[in-house]
């Protein structure tokens, strides 16, 4: 069956957006690599924002220069950028396989005028691809602003990047659709095909990778936002450190509640975020161990450690709750038994219309042959 003109228009537009998506992916992979080498247009190494060995938790910020606060250092920032690149690379491979799967399925499995648009909705809508392109563009701007040491502009850019990542992950899992409509769309996926593998196997894996990356992005956003706040107001550096950790705790708690109350309806296995939260806690513990003397001298090592451990235990407990709900408390699927077919014989019954000739209507009888013979005699 041929697709409708609107379906073909969506199909062609989707492919053009994918081409732009792949171009943006190449650029987002090139910028961090180019920014790591001197002489390529970037004035400073973006991973080393400030000298954190000079951090003083008991002083207030000083105007006209950058006051060091808690932030990711070179190894942690490099690890975060590497994780982001790997997830974006996985997403690019996913969309490539999704496009290939739709091209192959288009030859034999188009059964309605809107089949192509339904498949595209299951793989990734044009809006979702556009949000993914904006994500990769903002991470490039973030690296460029960091290389110029513009902490305020970098915090603003990363705020946009974080909001786009939040929206992208939520839309990727739920697709902003009713659950029953997604069940209908899933029935339109041809079984035992590449499209079936992409939608039901590769897509959940990519969703968990994006959740893992979102857990790290919450940490980077908290540190960037509070560093900009700390260098804008006359406050103690220790207050900025506590503010960043507590903001990260609030974001993690919010996403845990959103997951258990809403997202699990669409995808039950969402363990990637909790793993990202645990890695984020390790990123916070590294400077606490690296500059232990500074934190001990300010009598802040124990309070900061307790706050970080609260996030660690929250992620661990949430992961255990999710596993328990998946295994023990998940509703069992109803069991169906095939209905035994009986001998059904159709009979024609005359119905007299009050304002016209008699109407013939088909009836059904599942009784034995004796009843049918009696009806024929009558």
Curated annotation (Swiss-Prot):
The chain crosses the membrane at residues 17-37, 85-105, 119-139, 151-171, 211-231, 240-260, 269-289, 304-324. Signal peptide: none annotated. Its main location: virion. It is a multi-pass membrane protein. Residues 363-378 have a biased composition (Acidic residues). Keywords: Disulfide bond, Glycoprotein, Host endosome, Host Golgi apparatus, Host membrane, Host nucleus, Membrane, Transmembrane, Transmembrane helix, Viral envelope protein, Virion. Belongs to the herpesviridae glycoprotein M family. This is Envelope glycoprotein M. The lineage of its organism: Viruses, Duplodnaviria, Heunggongvirae, Peploviricota, Herviviricetes. The gene is gM.
């Amino acid at each position: 069956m041929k697709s409708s003109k609107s379906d073909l228009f969506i199909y062609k537009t989707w492919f053009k957006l994918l081409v732009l998506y792949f171009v943006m992916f190449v650029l987002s992979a090139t910028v961090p690599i180019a920014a790591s080498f001197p002489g390529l247009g970037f004035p400073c190494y973006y991973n080393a924002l400030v000298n954190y060995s000079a951090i003083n938790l008991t002083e207030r910020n000083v105007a006209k220069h950058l006051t060091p606060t808690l932030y990711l250092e070179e190894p942690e920032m490099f690890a975060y950028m590497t994780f982001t690149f790997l997830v974006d690379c996985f997403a690019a491979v996913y969309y490539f396989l999704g496009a290939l799967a739709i091209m192959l399925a288009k030859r034999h499995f188009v059964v309605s005028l809107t089949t192509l648009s339904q498949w595209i909705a299951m793989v990734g809508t044009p809006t979702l691809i556009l949000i993914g392109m904006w994500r990769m563009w903002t991470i490039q701007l973030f690296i460029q602003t960091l290389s110029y040491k513009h902490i305020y502009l970098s915090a603003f850019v990363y705020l946009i990047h974080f909001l786009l990542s939040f929206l992208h992950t939520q839309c990727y899992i739920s697709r902003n659709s009713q659950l029953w409509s997604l069940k209908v769309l899933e029935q339109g996926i041809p079984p035992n095909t590449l499209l079936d593998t992409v939608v039901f196997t590769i897509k959940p894996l990519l969703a968990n990778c994006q959740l893992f990356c979102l857990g790290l992005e919450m940490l980077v956003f908290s540190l960037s936002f509070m560093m900009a706040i700390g260098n804008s107001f006359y406050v103690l550096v220790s207050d900025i450190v506590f503010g960043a950790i507590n903001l990260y705790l609030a974001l993690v708690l919010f996403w845990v509640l959103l997951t258990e109350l809403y997202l699990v309806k669409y995808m039950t296995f969402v363990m990637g975020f909790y793993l990202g939260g645990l890695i984020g806690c390790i990123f916070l513990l590294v400077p606490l161990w690296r500059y232990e003397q500074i934190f001990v001298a300010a009598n802040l090592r124990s309070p900061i450690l307790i706050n970080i451990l609260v996030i660690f235990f929250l992620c661990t407990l949430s992961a255990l709750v999710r596993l328990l709900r998946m295994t023990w408390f998940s509703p069992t699927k109803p069991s169906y038994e095939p209905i035994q077919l009986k001998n059904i014989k159709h009979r024609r019954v005359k119905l007299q219309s009050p304002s016209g000739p008699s109407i013939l209507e088909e009836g059904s009888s599942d009784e034995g042959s004796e009843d049918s013979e009696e009806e024929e005699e009558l």
